[in-house]
Amino acid sequence: MPSIDLNCDLGESFGAYTIGMDAEILPYVTSANIACGFHAGDPSVMQKSVLLCKKYGVQVGAHPGLPDLQGFGRRRMAIPPAEAEADVMYQIGALKAFCDAAGVPLHHVKPHGALYNMTARDPVLAAAICRAVQAAPPDAVLLALSGSEMVKAANAIGLPVASEVFADRGYQADGSLVPRGAPGAMIEDEDTAIARVLQMAAQGTVQADDGSTVTLQADSVCVHGDGPKALSFVQKISAALLAAGTAVAAF
């Protein structure tokens, strides 16, 4: 039976602020991307998130972002590649400390927000982030947008990479995501989103915002856990994949 991973972003609370439905979502995903303190999260939340993943048998990933707590890491920055590389190494190391304490491996690394989108298009920045991930624990996998510069950069240095697709995001004809705030950026209708996930999993294609067909490699599907219908949405995606003959399993 073919399989696909379901991943979600986790541990985005910090201080007095609670974001997401972490404990409720985890039983239905197979890997999680934990914020490492730069765009969200704090040491206590990181520790709690790792322990929650261990409880539910979910693979732990680092989710490093730009140093932008106020903007939730979604604002682009003119950051030098060497500085971004150091920032990502720092964040990976912080999460690995909690993984080591909990006795679980650091399975993967997925950049967050603006850093994710910038590295998807910028080959120099992508190469810098791939070097940071390669310096991480042995066998840590890069999780990156399908067809992006990150995937190319990882392949160029022999870094293991899994290609990611999105359940609730619109695509442009070049395979990039429709920018947040633009028309078609978010797929609001659950049935439409689920149908797109099934198509990506079975056929490796998705319809772009201009009506063209984009070819994708779908190793993992990102599902967001911070919306009011997040839990039911994840449950429905998991059930639909199983009904279509696709197992849900970590990459």
In which residue ranges do the predicted regions lie?
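Conserved, mostly hydrophobic/aromatic
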Residues: 9, 63, 109, 223
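Acidic (Asp/Glu)-rich catalytic clusters
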Residues: 23-27, 48-61, 100-101
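C-terminal domain-boundary segment and adjacent tail
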Residues: 140, 232-251
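Active-site rim beta-loop-alpha module in soluble metabolic enzymes
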Residues: 147-205
